[in-house]
Design a protein with these regions (language model features):
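A structural "hinge/loop" feature
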Residues: 1, 9, 34-41, 106-118, ...
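N-terminal lobe/hinge region of extracytoplasmic solute-binding protein
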Residues: 1-17, 141
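A short, compositionally biased micro-patch
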Residues: 8, 17, 92, 151-152
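Surface-exposed binding/hinge segments that line
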Residues: 14, 18-25, 44-50, 54-124
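Extracytoplasmic/periplasmic ligand-capture domains
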Residues: 27-60, 145-282, 301-325
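Short catalytic/ligand-binding loop motif for oxyanion handling, primarily in non-cytosolic enzymes
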Residues: 33, 107-109, 279-280, 290-291
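Gly/Pro-rich hinge or "lid" segments in bacterial periplasmic/extracellular proteins
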Residues: 82-85, 94-95, 101-177, 187
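Mature extracytoplasmic/periplasmic domains
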Residues: 120-129, 283-309
């Protein structure tokens, strides 16, 4: 609920006083399994070292998130160093992994949850060679709650519960089937939900069939976190190029520049744009406001005295002059 990290493969962790060293104590008895459910090995601290080295050697796309964080990793990735032992990851013992950072990062634990930081069993990696990680059941070694059972491109992906998963009692879905949708027939998704083929399907609030679906399934419709985003749209107050504009004369260019430098003009643009109407083109009238943001975080991220940050700002702005009221 509050975004707190809950250990899984690790039981606990500690941070050095200078914030540079993170030490993780691994859960004992967690096993690797093949796609057939056969026990392969125990998950050990060295698997995390192997995993990071594999990502670095393979120039993983996710490296940019961590390579400037972990001591020596950027140098290894760039080729400045070819000695991975200089990289700030170490298996202290079978159940203790230690990471050394270049500088303190209070958000470091959130990076540990990314795919680049996952463990890799060295023996399995070497046995598979270039086929390691292939999107087939046998190309993957498993320590999580599900096995990949099948993957057909542009068709379906199927998973089955790992009966030996260490936390299996908290895994309540036995089979997962993900069906491919090509983005064409939006009505087909709702039909598959209605006939029981899907247990979850996306609805499109701007489709012709949505009003009827909303009445029929009003208690089943939920809005997922809205992440369709346009970042940092601003006014160019130092315009130099007029290549892609109808403003061609010096007088027109001068007038344009004066307008852009005028605060009232810029505010008029901001206040005149009907963001709700714009957002409703995708989310419909009822869901439009769920897309709107004035901040990089949800409006409820900071609250005090029963009011969220946006409400507090609105109350304060009226005291700052007529231009904000």
């Amino acid at each position: 609920k509050y975004g707190n990290l809950i250990p899984s493969l690790a039981e606990d962790w500690s941070v050095s006083k200078d914030g540079l060293t993170y030490t993780y104590k691994l859960r004992k008895g967690v096993k690797w399994y093949t796609s057939d459910g056969e026990e392969y090995a125990e998950v050990k601290a060295k698997d995390f070292v192997t995993g990071l080295k594999h990502a670095a050697d393979g120039k993983s796309d996710g490296l940019s998130l961590i390579q400037d964080s972990i001591k020596g990793l950027a140098e290894y990735v760039s080729g400045e160093s070819n000695d991975f032992s200089t990289v700030g990851v170490k298996a202290v013992d079978d159940y203790t992994v230690e990471y050394t950072l270049n500088k303190p990062e209070s958000f470091w634990n959130s990076k540990v949850t990314t795919a680049t930081m996952l463990p890799v069993n060295e023996e399995f990696l070497n046995s598979k060679g270039s086929d390691y990680g292939a999107p087939t059941p046998s190309g993957i070694l498993y320590n999580g709650p599900y096995f990949l059972k099948s993957l057909t491109s542009k068709s379906v992906i199927e998973y089955e519960k790992n009966p030996n998963y260490w936390d299996k009692d908290n895994v309540h879905i036995d089979k997962v089937k993900l069906s491919f949708w090509d983005g064409q027939d939006t009505g087909k998704l709702a039909e598959n939900f209605k006939d029981g083929s899907f247990t979850m399907a996306r609805l499109f609030p701007t489709s012709a069939s949505y009003p009827e679906l909303e009445k029929e399934f009003k208690d089943n419709i939920v809005y997922t976190p809205q992440d369709s985003t346009t970042y940092l749209v601003g006014t160019n107050i130092d315009r130099q190029s007029y290549k892609y504009t109808s403003k061609t004369t010096d007088e027109q260019k001068t007038s344009t520049k004066k307008a852009l430098l005028n605060k009232d003009f810029r505010q008029a643009l901001a206040f005149g744009f009907d963001r709700k109407a714009y957002a409703s083109q995708v989310n419909g009238a009822n869901g439009a406001t769920k897309l709107l943001r004035n901040l990089f975080v949800p409006p409820t991220f900071v609250q005090a005295d029963g009011k969220n940050f946006g409400e507090m700002v609105k109350d304060k702005l009226v005291t700052y002059g007529d231009e904000w009221s």
